[in-house]
Amino acid sequence: MTLTLHDIKVWNTGEVIDLIVPSDTDETVDASVMTIAPGFEDPHVHFRDPGQTYKESMVSGCAAAASGGYTNVLIMPNTVPAMDGVKVTAGEQGASEVLDAGFDTVIDYLQHYEQAHDVTLPVRYDLCVCASKGRAGKEATDVADWVGYLPEHDDDNKDAYQLCHPVTAISDDGSAVTPEILDQVFDNVKESGLYLIEHCEHHDTGAVNEGPVSRELGVPGIPEDTELRIVERDIEMARKTGVHVHFQHVSTAISFDAIRKAKAEGLPITCETAPHYIALCDEALLKYGTLAKMNPPLRSEEDRKATIAAVADGTVDLLATDHAPHTMEEKDLGFLDAPNGIIGLECAYGVCHKILVDGGFISDERLIELMSTAPAELMGHIKADITALLDEYADAVPGDDDTKRVLDLGKVPAEDRADLVVLNIDEKWTVDPERFHSSARNTPFGGWQVTGQPLATIIGSKLVFSRINKED
């Protein structure tokens, strides 16, 4: 059985084709308003599994990703216990989930999650290992504890990964790498050949951005230079060591200025920002309350505009969601006690399209690059080249203009990794968190009218999610 999409447009060439996708049902659709593109990738998600599955699990997190058009994500290491390669201890929070599944480390647990839980997850995922043991910032992790999970690359083999879910990055996300272990962590990154993902924010007090809004709320503020200090420190480390540093969720004009200068110098620096820093400033706290509380905090309107400018001029290499599920009960605790973060996988494309494309700052094609090919390059993934797939596997449409081609994904081998997303770039829709596939609902974007929606997600040539001709 197949889903046949007539007259769908290829994202980067404009070629109109027919696309046949293996499916559970037979259906033929007029796809003249649709676009086929490489699947989105997100190098910054928190799925809370193990240890906090009341917030999110691998099952619900991957379902949310597929719904948002994502085909690959990178799991951050602030699981409970932490993803540090160290054997878990019976009695510590989350340990029973790991031990009861028959494993003794979180890396092993997530490496074999599908087999242990008898599920098939609809999204590919890689793992990010902690920079410090227990993510406590006191002692660097031992490379020997996780070196066996590194990807094995073979330029002559399209199936580049020998592991299903390899460790591809190092981070203490949620915290910056501490000064005490900074040199050792950079040594570990260099030895392993990975890259460092840095949470570029360090502060001991404060809950929201320091400024008029924090004073109006009577809440301790976080100065913007708490971000800049980490950015400048790690730029200097990149200059000294040659290690690739990737800065997460950059949010201030002064940090973007420092990153621009480092890139102009040719240093191995990349950075991301998130949809919320593009769409919201700290004034959103007055409307959305703790649903707009995150770390780094939402900054000033001037910083929001600077973030958009950094996306437009190429300083920002990619967009990542920092998908961070929490319960609404936790978010109701008030500004001082509510946890930081929001979910974002299921509305990221629409929010970014509304602000960046509809706002005239970038093109449709550039947004797809920022959410697909650019993060794939960071994570070392081979993205599907749709034109190459057409050249190798397509046929002429029978009885039609012989210039029109039909691509039957059923003929494309799995090793070609045809991971794709079907988009309606012009569809207007309303964000409704109650319809999300995530277990969480903590988003300030509920009720927003956005433009552009993922309609179907394809992994390895197979349809894993579709809302085509459906209510969802």
Enumerate the language-model features and the residues they cover.
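Active-site mouth loops of central-metabolism enzymes
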Residues: P43-E56, D126-A140, G174, G218-D225
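N-terminal metal-binding scaffold of metallo-dependent hydrolase/deaminase domains
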Residues: M1-D30
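Divalent metal-coordination and catalytic microenvironments
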Residues: I8, V33, H44, A65, ...
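His/Asp/Glu-enriched, well-ordered alpha-helical/loop segment
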Residues: E216-H244, A312-D313, L318, P325-L420
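C-terminal cap of metal-dependent C-N hydrolases
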Residues: G334-D337, E392-N469
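Histidine/acidic residue-rich metal-binding segments in metalloenzymes
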Residues: T141-L319
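Alpha-helix-loop-beta-strand connector modules within alpha/beta enzyme cores
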Residues: F103-V123, D187-E198, C347-V351
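Metal-associated gating/positioning segment near the N- to mid-region
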Residues: M34-T120
